[in-house]
Swiss-Prot record:
InterPro entries per record: CFAP77
A cellular component term, taken from the record's GO annotations: cytoplasm
Example GO biological process: integrin-mediated signaling pathway
Entry similarity comment: Belongs to the CFAP77 family.
Function comment: Microtubule inner protein (MIP) part of the dynein-decorated doublet microtubules (DMTs) in cilia axoneme, which is required for motile cilia beating.
Subcellular location: Cytoplasm, Cytoskeleton, Cilium axoneme; Cytoplasm, Cytoskeleton, Flagellum axoneme
Ranges annotated as spanning the membrane: none
Any one Pfam family match given in the protein's UniProt record, by short name: CFAP77
The protein's name: Cilia- and flagella-associated protein 77
Keywords, alphabetical: Cell projection, Cilium, Cytoplasm, Cytoskeleton, Flagellum
Domain of life according to the entry: Eukaryota
Chief subcellular location: cytoplasm
Listed GO MF terms: GTPase activator activity
Length: 240
């Protein structure tokens, strides 16, 4: 049961969902109009059936027409000719394309022809060859294991010879004696100027037990300063 309508009710109002009022007990319509009973859904097929005679005498093939196709520009050829002319920048190539025009040849039916497959002899056969059978005598005699051991021994001998040759060609490590021979004495830095009253002032702190211990420590420091980093030889050791 529909609610009463006021005003003129037109057929066009049934196509607008905002104006459609649902019937009591039914779902609301979406405003879709269906064609009449004489309308047939689907596409009409044209049957060109001439029987067996047409099927035997005619063979419909697709003909490729290239007359309506415009030839495309060959940018590869344009770039190649531009580079040959000495143009390398994008602006120069753009100007070259604007003043020159090279077109690609339109595709024809001959361009799609593929080479015929090679003719095969009727005696040719296609198969996968099987692995040759393993002789049972070699399995019983354990020859495969012996062969594997021999291959491993040959590989180890080659590896040892390579390592021995590499060790002989390696760099000889420097020792402390070689470093002392190559070292150069550090230049003595000039002493800073001091006031006359401070020239004969001794050290305020002496951490050695006696002058002999101090002398030994200074000699050891001077002998090891060659292999240490830094200007004064007080850094880490340079011998890796």
């Amino acid at each position: 049961m529909e609610s009463p309508r006021i005003g003129v009710v037109r057929d066009s109002m049934l196509h607008r969902p905002l104006l459609i009022k649902p019937t009591l007990g039914k779902s609301k319509s979406r405003g879709l109009s269906y064609p009449g009973p004489e309308f047939v859904f689907g596409t009409a097929t044209t049957v060109q059936d001439g029987g067996v005679q047409e099927a035997i005498s005619n063979w419909h093939t697709h003909t490729m027409s290239t007359t309506h196709r415009a030839a495309e520009r060959d940018f590869i050829a344009l770039n190649r000719e531009g580079v040959k002319s000495g143009l390398v920048t994008a602006k120069e190539l753009h100007q070259y394309r604007a003043t020159h025009d090279i077109r690609r040849k339109p595709l024809t039916r001959e361009g799609f022809r593929r080479s015929a497959p090679p003719r095969l002899s009727p005696d040719d056969s296609f198969f996968v060859s099987n692995r040759p059978s393993t002789p049972i005598s070699e399995l019983i005699e354990y020859k495969y294991a012996q062969r594997w051991l021999e291959e491993q021994q040959v590989r180890d001998r080659v590896l040892q010879a390579h390592q021995h040759k590499k060790a002989q060609l390696g760099r000889i490590q420097d020792t402390r004696t070689t470093l002392l021979r190559k070292s150069q004495p550090l230049p003595e830095a000039p002493s800073t100027w001091k006031l006359p009253r401070f020239q004969k002032v001794g050290a305020a702190l002496d951490t050695f037990r006696d002058p002999e211990a101090r002398k030994k420590a200074m000699n050891a420091h001077c002998s090891e300063s060659v292999s240490r980093r830094g200007i004064l030889g007080q850094g880490t050791y340079t011998v890796d």
